[in-house]
Curated annotation (Swiss-Prot):
NAD(+) binds at residues 108-112, 134-136, 140, 257, 304, 329-330, 363-364. One of its GO terms (biological process) is spermidine metabolic process. Homotetramer. It catalyses: [eIF5A protein]-L-lysine + spermidine = [eIF5A protein]-deoxyhypusine + propane-1,3-diamine. The keyword Transmembrane does not apply. Its EC number is 2.5.1.46. Keywords: Hypusine biosynthesis, NAD, Transferase. Belongs to the deoxyhypusine synthase family. Pathway: Protein modification; eIF5A hypusination. This is Deoxyhypusine synthase. GO terms for cellular component: cytoplasm. Its cofactor is NAD(+). It comes from Saccharomyces cerevisiae (strain ATCC 204508 / S288c). The gene is DYS1.
């Protein structure tokens, strides 16, 4: 202690000059990127993420999210030949080894945005095993195949836009004509689906409802309807198209909460007295059964609300997910599910206590492209970890 400090009152010494405990050897030093160094120029996404891990705040959470995604992708269990028949219900890799079942959820605004192409990439290349989205996440994907969405501004006035037939999603603009084109496209499909439903009921009788787990049965569930839309749109820019082609189910428990709901409502008048029926119970059985069959379960939740809880609740059926990555801007002070951190889900049994989890507080559009570039699309081989 210096001479000056020795002359300070003891109270000041204790308050301001309090000694620290010894720093543990495993403490990580905060450090950012030194762009004056040659290796910091033209960095790959993987290198950038590695450097962000030690920056602190949400940059470190981005790094943690990438680590967890890599972990859920790398886990491997037994080979299918080592299993009894009743154990062969989960997901397997191309070599026949058990792998993590990855559930991805996203809100409709992300499909409206340019993140749609990132989400399509993940489904196109079979990097997720099931999807949960809201009605807008279904219809906006289809509508973008028919007409584009445009960049606007957050500050554009609602009255003026309404007069011009322009719908605003944040700083995006969707011409109302897009929804008119959507109606023209979807109504004939709904007509055909109703026809197939009626023919099936006539052939099999009322008991055909018992066969609703038959994927070819036109007793429609939301996921079956969405699969049909993906088949009908036949457009490689579409998430739904690739989900249909790769047999990846897209669940939407709120299918009527959007333009699709409007179309179904309009169709009730057109088809009356006949009605298209949609069974939500069939889908809750399907997604919960997927969770129960999973050898390990991972959640990638982009946004909040229904899509977040629907996946988390499915994971409750297996006593919790093994991995969880949340990305949203929700805060927990109001008790909202969107704002809740992973530890709250642990209390409900929706995430395992020993699970790897993180909540990244960020706008998905700003971080997901970077995260995907550093993980799913990095080009680096998956380091398969057998356990």
């Amino acid at each position: 202690m210096s001479d000056i400090n020795e002359k300070l009152p003891e109270l000041l010494q204790d308050a301001v000059l309090k000694a620290s405990v010894p720093i543990p050897d495993d403490f990580v030093k905060v450090q950012g990127i030194d762009y004056s160094k040659p290796e910091a120029t033209n960095m790959r996404a993987t290198d950038l993420i590695e450097a962000m891990k030690t920056m602190g705040f949400q940059a470190s959470s981005v790094g943690t999210a990438c680590e967890i995604i890599d972990s859920m992708r790398s886990w491997r269990g037994k080979h299918i030949d080592e299993l009894d028949d009743h154990e062969k219900k989960g997901c397997f890799d191309e070599e026949g080894y058990q792998k993590t079942t990855i559930f991805m959820g996203y809100t409709s605004n992300l499909i409206s945005s340019g993140v749609r192409e990132t989400l399509r990439y993940l489904v196109q290349h079979k990097m997720v095993d099931a999807v949960v989205t809201s009605a807008g996440g279904v219809e906006e994907d289809l509508i973008k195949c028919l007409a584009p969405t445009y960049l606007g501004e957050f500050a554009l006035k609602g009255k003026s836009l309404r007069d011009q037939g322009m719908n605003r999603i944040g700083n995006l603009l969707v011409p109302n004509d897009n929804y008119c084109k959507f109606e023209e496209w979807i109504v004939p499909i709904l007509d055909k689906m109703l026809e197939e439903q009626d023919e099936y009921v006539k052939k099999h009788g009322a008991d055909c409802l018992e066969a609703n787990q038959d994927v070819d049965s036109p007793i429609w569930t939301p996921s079956k309807m969405i699969d049909r839309f993906g088949k009908e749109i036949n457009d490689e820019s579409s998430v739904l198209y690739w989900a249909h082609k790769n047999k990846i189910p897209i669940f939407c428990p709120s299918l009527t909460d959007g333009s699709i709901g409007d179309m179904l409502f309009f169709h009730t008048f057109k088809a009356s007295p006949k009605q298209l029926r949609v069974d939500i119970v069939g889908d809750i059985r399907k997604i919960n059964s997927m969770s129960m069959a999973a050898y390990r379960a991972g959640m990638i939740i982009l946004g909040g609300g229904l899509i977040k809880h629907h996946i988390a609740n499915a994971c409750l059926m297996r006593n919790g997910a093994d991995y969880a990555v949340y990305i949203n801007t929700g805060q927990e002070y109001d008790g909202s599910d969107a704002g809740a951190r992973p530890d709250e889900a642990v209390s409900w049994g929706k995430i395992k206590a020993e699970a790897k989890s993180v909540k990244l507080f960020a706008d998905v559009t700003t971080v997901l492209p970077l995260i995907v570039a550093a993980t799913f699309a990095s080009g680096k081989p998956i380091k398969k970890v057998k356990n």
